[in-house]
Amino acid sequence: MNRETAERCTIVRGLVGSTVHGLNVNDGIEDRDEMGICVEPLEEAMALWAPFEQFIYRTAAEREGRDDARSTAGDLDLTIYSLRKWTRLALKGNPTIMLLLFTPEDQLVYCDELGAELRALTPAIVSRRVQGPFLGYLQAQKQRLTGERGQKRIHRPELEEMYGFDTKYAMHMLRLGFQGVGC
């Protein structure tokens, strides 16, 4: 599915990155992270080939010509999930996928009637069963941050140099822990 179709079929789209959580560092290199959910067109849903699951668009990757390009000020990192994939992951308690359920109204880029209905179902989707996945995700983030699991991840070398670790990554890790406790 191409970007035009993914955006045309979107039912809800909003900010999901550090800005929406109040964790942006205002260092002039903030990108814009957005997530959306779309209802794939009938021809995609009924296709004989692998069904559409997600569309990813990154202006940094497009500009640099490589997928691992670091986003800079003004870049857009957009992921649009099919409703089918989003639902499967949400019911498993995936912390990232559930962000759109809690994104404040003023941080939504787009929300039609179906998107509003989906967001209204939040109490039916979220249960205490999500605490396990949240805890697992939190532990994996900590292990990546400290190098206990695989190679130590350094996304922001300037923060690593200044504080000894990536403080923004650490704040996202703590946010996940608090969100999991609140469920």
Predicted regions and their residues:
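Conserved NTP/Mg2+-binding pocket subregion across the NTase superfamily
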Residues: 57-181
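Active-site nucleotide-donor binding segment shared across nucleotidyl transfer reactions
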Residues: 1-49
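Cytochrome P450 catalytic domain signature, combining two hallmark sequence patches
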Residues: 52-55
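Short, solvent-exposed secondary-structure capping/transition elements
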Residues: 44-47, 99, 182-183
